[in-house]
Amino acid sequence: MSEYSLFTSESVSEGHPDKIADQVSDAILDAILAEDPEARVACETLVKTGMVLVAGEVRTNAWVDIEEIARGVIREIGYNSSDMGFDWESCAVMNAIGKQSADIAVGVDEAGEHEQGAGDQGLMFGFATNETDVLMPAPITYAHRLVQRQAEVRKNGTLDFLRPDAKSQVTFRYDENGKPCAIDAVVLSTQHSASVKQADLREAVMEEIIKPVLPAEWLSKETKYFINPTGQFIIGGPVGDCGLTGRKIIVDTYGGMARHGGGAFSGKDPSKVDRSAAYAGRYVAKNIVAAGLADKCEIQISYAIGVAEPTSISINTFGTGKVSDAVISQLVREHFELRPAGLIKMLDLKRPIYLPTAAYGHFGREGENFTWEKTDKADALRKAAGL
């Protein structure tokens, strides 16, 4: 038997408590950016039974109705009945947003000859791999697609007994060349109404969610399926668990296959390099892989608060590079702008584009607003590398 290794990633649905919080934070960010593209926003959300608490720091002259925004997000997700214990109409919405410190603005804002500095110190990673069509790791890609499908069949009425809270997990087998060759295990847990029998639920999830999403060539008689393995899952959402912004940073990125600098994304305007530089890192890594310079690429970028130039840029292609990592690193410096103001302009980030990122991953997504997914630098990189 040939040698193989296993790798697992998980995702959660838009109705998971932590993801509700992420979406509320990003909806508020979008509403502010729509009125004031120069706003500074750091918006955190907590959700629990019957309540939403929004807190953080904002600097803007714009006014937005935070209560209305939060209720709208919860309604769209599908918490629309008091039977679920969480309802967009009856939940309390509390606002504890304050002003951003003027000390931060001194180092971060552009003023005359002073170039915009990083909003904080920190390290960020970007990653890409050619094992899927979206140049993302297979486990996180299919984990996301499972919970996206759960939301789709819940909302369109195909499986009307499903409720918003759900989680998925996919374990892939990788061959001796490091390529995905089979799916070893699939876990899908979904909240549901009390009326459905477990046997009916499991059959419906298998036929309407798992089979349409996972490629048949990766499934076999050896694939293990765990559908609601603990039995019934009636109590869920913010009733079952408290939700907080920024607690699903591995779901948001690469499913654990790449390293993470620790900074969350949602609720942060693009002056925060936690978010914008991680997006730029993805853009760099994806273009390197799309150009054929490597099968797999991870970039680390780091910053000092108030300083524009990155304190470091490093590249790792895990031995898959067609040219050396040092050559790729030099190409990155020549072809990409990684100072805060430059990368914000490069990716056009001062726009209300963030709510769609707050569920089902920030990377490997399609749509013109996911500017960091473009591969428009691939040809220039390929030519510059002499490939």
From Swiss-Prot:
Subcellular location: Cytoplasm
Enzyme class: transferase
Superkingdom in the source lineage: Bacteria
Keyword annotations: ATP-binding, Cytoplasm, Magnesium, Metal-binding, Nucleotide-binding, One-carbon metabolism, Potassium, Transferase
Residues that, per the record, bind Mg(2+): D18
Region entry Flexible loop, spans: 100-110
Entries under Pfam families matching the protein: S-AdoMet_synt_C (PF02773), S-AdoMet_synt_M (PF02772), S-AdoMet_synt_N (PF00438)
This protein's record includes keyword Cell membrane: no
The protein's required cofactors: Mg(2+); K(+)
Annotated residues for binding of K(+): E44
Function: Catalyzes the formation of S-adenosylmethionine (AdoMet) from methionine and ATP. The overall synthetic reaction is composed of two sequential steps, AdoMet formation and the subsequent tripolyphosphate hydrolysis which occurs prior to release of AdoMet from the enzyme.
Protein name as catalogued: S-adenosylmethionine synthase
Gene: metK
